[in-house]
């Protein structure tokens, strides 16, 4: 889900 792209770490 691109909304959570900031969590991709």
UniProtKB/Swiss-Prot annotation:
One of its GO terms (cellular component) is extracellular region. GO terms for biological process: neuropeptide signaling pathway. The keyword Transferase does not apply. The modification Phenylalanine amide is found at residue 9. It is found in: Secreted. Keywords: Amidation, Neuropeptide, Secreted. It comes from the Eukaryota. Disulfide bonds: none annotated. Belongs to the FARP (FMRFamide related peptide) family. This is FMRFamide-14. It comes from Sarcophaga bullata (Grey flesh fly). The lineage of its organism: Eukaryota, Metazoa, Ecdysozoa, Arthropoda, Hexapoda.
């Amino acid at each position: 889900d691109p909304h959570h792209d900031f969590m991709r770490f």
